[in-house]
């Protein structure tokens, strides 16, 4: 004697946030920010063998104003960091970021002054994807995990507050590793 038996068939009970999340996850438009080896794997993911179109990502967008997902693939130099931030700021809300590869996530093997030790110091990151470089299957798995996160995301004032908190955390983040080794 559950709720399903009391309602006539053809009815669906949900919330506005769940319905909007279901629609949003099926129409994510990625912008590429490929900087190194990981960019090759990201391009492979969009090709015929892996076919990102089945997840609602027909084409990588050339303009950040048409995208709501930024895939940062590869190492980010100190000179490239302001450009990365500018591209992120030009994206419309809601926006998400995948940090693809160990170089984007933590600086990787480039432990020196010229490379940002994790893009989470510049933009808030939603999904971290490990690997050097990660395989296309791993990127697809990260996109599916992002779909789950998008489907459960908040709307309105709650979304603005969550975005503001993530932004502040990204700007206050401490370096992930201490620079040691041959250079110090």
Curated annotation (Swiss-Prot):
Required co-factors: [4Fe-4S] cluster
EC number: 7.1.1.-
GO cellular component terms, A-Z: plasma membrane; respiratory chain complex I
Predominant location category: membrane
Function according to Swiss-Prot or TrEMBL: NDH-1 shuttles electrons from NADH, via FMN and iron-sulfur (Fe-S) centers, to quinones in the respiratory chain. The immediate electron acceptor for the enzyme in this species is believed to be a menaquinone. Couples the redox reaction to proton translocation (for every two electrons transferred, four hydrogen ions are translocated across the cytoplasmic membrane), and thus conserves the redox energy in a proton gradient.
Subunit structure, interactors included: NDH-1 is composed of 14 different subunits. Subunits NuoB, C, D, E, F, and G constitute the peripheral sector of the complex.
Protein name: NADH-quinone oxidoreductase subunit B 1
Organism annotation: Streptomyces avermitilis (strain ATCC 31267 / DSM 46492 / JCM 5070 / NBRC 14893 / NCIMB 12804 / NRRL 8165 / MA-4680)
Organism phylogeny: Bacteria, Bacillati, Actinomycetota, Actinomycetes, Kitasatosporales
Gene name of the record: nuoB1
């Amino acid at each position: 004697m559950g709720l399903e038996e009391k309602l006539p068939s053809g009815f669906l009970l949900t919330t506005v946030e769940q319905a909007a999340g279901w629609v949003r996850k099926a129409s994510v438009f990625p912008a590429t920010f490929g900087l190194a080896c990981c960019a090759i794997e990201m391009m492979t993911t969009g090709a015929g063998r892996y076919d990102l179109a089945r997840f609602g990502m027909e084409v990588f967008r050339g303009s950040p104003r048409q995208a709501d997902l930024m895939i940062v693939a590869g190492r980010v130099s100190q000179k490239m960091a302001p450009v990365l931030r500018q591209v992120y700021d030009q994206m419309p809300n809601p926006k998400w970021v995948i940090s693809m590869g160990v170089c984007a996530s933590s600086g990787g093997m480039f432990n020196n002054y010229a490379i940002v030790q994790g893009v989470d110091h510049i933009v808030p990151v939603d999904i971290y994807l490990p690997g050097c470089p990660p395989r296309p299957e791993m990127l697809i798995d990260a996109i599916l995990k992002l779909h789950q996160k998008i489907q459960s995301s908040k709307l309105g004032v709650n979304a603005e507050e969550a975005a503001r908190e993530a932004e502040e955390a990204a700007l206050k983040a401490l370096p992930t590793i201490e620079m040691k080794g041959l250079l110090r």
